[in-house]
Amino acid sequence: MSHAMDLLHVFILAVIQGLAELLPVSSSAHVILAEKLMGFDPSAPNMTFLLVMLHTGTMFAVIVYFWHSWKKTYFFDWQSFKQRAWYVLLATAITGVLGLLLQSLIKHVFFGGVSSFEIEHLFSNSKLMAAALAAAGILIILSSRLDRGQQGDIRLPSAMIIGAVQALCLPFRGFSRSGATISTGLFLGISRQKAEEFSFALAVVLTPAVIVKELVRLLHAQHATTGATHLALGSLLLPSIFGMVFSFLTGLLALKWLSAWLEHGRWYLFGIYCLAFSGVVLTLA
């Protein structure tokens, strides 16, 4: 981020993050494209710090929005809580293990041992993002076509499968995590509401890990630059808090929108949007 960053830029990025992070359309693709169009370097330390704050805002939006339904589903009684918590933690563990294995495979087999930060930069390539968006769009449309209003619940095998699918999304900028996990739930016969609740329960557990990863990236970048970066971060604190608040508010609106469209059988429209946006990304590449 540079001296040209102002509250308007922060507001725009916060709104994009709040909408795209919680709708199944890939926040990373939207935020990276917006940053590039505004002339900012997505890999700059200050942009990473802002992204951490925006992620924090959307995480709290998820907690606030789903708290009431989670109380009925996850905290109904102690036995129910233990079972649901086990499913969430197991799925997250599978995501973590498979994600690390996939990253190692990509790192050593395809890119000859480059650093994890360089791999993420490579996967920010516009053509790869467009391909990931198109794949996500097709997955969402197919799951919508196969959805017949089923009323299944999360079980151990489905939790494991969803966790594995979530891991496959991690390296690919443009492949929506929520889109993939909800679609997988629908493929497995899980009800729309249960698939949505489980997907965002996973998000609340996974997001702190993402935030820590971004902070590690920030520290890594700071060590490679001068002390001027520290001064820039200090000046960014208040604008970032401003952005966090708006990503929280926008996130609440996005979740309400998502729930309504999912419940009323309009899930496929997000897939159409992903396909259209992949074309936009390719055009602007």
From Swiss-Prot:
Class of enzymatic activity (EC top level): hydrolase
InterPro entries named in the record: UppP
EC numbers, comma separated: 3.6.1.27
MF annotations from Gene Ontology: undecaprenyl-diphosphatase activity
UniProt superkingdom: Bacteria
Subcellular location(s) per record: Cell inner membrane
Alphabetical UniProt keywords: Antibiotic resistance, Cell inner membrane, Cell membrane, Cell shape, Cell wall biogenesis/degradation, Hydrolase, Membrane, Peptidoglycan synthesis, Transmembrane, Transmembrane helix
Keyword field contains Lipid biosynthesis: no
GO cellular component terms listed in the entry, alphabetical order: plasma membrane
Transmembrane segments: 5-25, 47-67, 86-106, 122-142, 156-176, 198-218, 235-255, 265-285
Membrane topology annotation: Multi-pass membrane protein
Catalytic activity as recorded in UniProt: di-trans,octa-cis-undecaprenyl diphosphate + H2O = di-trans,octa-cis-undecaprenyl phosphate + phosphate + H(+)
Something else known: Bacitracin is thought to be involved in the inhibition of peptidoglycan synthesis by sequestering undecaprenyl diphosphate, thereby reducing the pool of lipid carrier available.
Family indicated by similarity: Belongs to the UppP family.
Functional description taken from the UniProt entry: Catalyzes the dephosphorylation of undecaprenyl diphosphate (UPP). Confers resistance to bacitracin.
Protein name (record): Undecaprenyl-diphosphatase 2
Gene (UniProt): uppP2
